[in-house]
Amino acid sequence: MRREERNMDKLLISFLLSLFMVYFPPSDVVLPSQFEASTDSYVPMSSYPQETQSAKTPSPGSMHPAELIKEYSPLAQSVRQLSVKPLDEPLINRLEKALAVPVKYQSNYLRI
């Protein structure tokens, strides 16, 4: 019974605290209704260069293939760099020769 009272007290305190924070926010919080476009503290929504650039990028359907390749070449380059490439056959053979453990030294070696 005492445990339920503690849980109820915690719930009530957290609810009252959240209501207090909604109606009396800290002084450094500025609500959108308090903004004026003429003040120095106004920051436009797309203030980052990536956002403005992506907003200006035309849709892929309206571009020619050459322009499309030019626009997305950094993306294609990063995909090419990060993709896993298959190893050449001679390199695989060299790795097998260098890293292979002879059969007689393996733990599962069986004598016939």
UniProtKB/Swiss-Prot annotation:
Transmembrane segments: none annotated. Residues 42-64 are annotated as: Disordered. Induction: Part of the khtSTU operon. Induced by salt stress at alkaline pH. It is found in: Cell membrane. It comes from the Bacteria. Its main location: membrane. Residues 47-60 have a biased composition (Polar residues). It is a peripheral membrane protein. Keywords: Cell membrane, Membrane. GO terms for cellular component: plasma membrane. Modulates the activity of the potassium/proton antiporter KhtU. Involved in protection of the cell from methylglyoxal, a toxic by-product of glycolysis. This is K(+)/H(+) antiporter modulator KhtS. It comes from Bacillus subtilis (strain 168). The lineage of its organism: Bacteria, Bacillati, Bacillota, Bacilli, Bacillales. The gene is khtS.
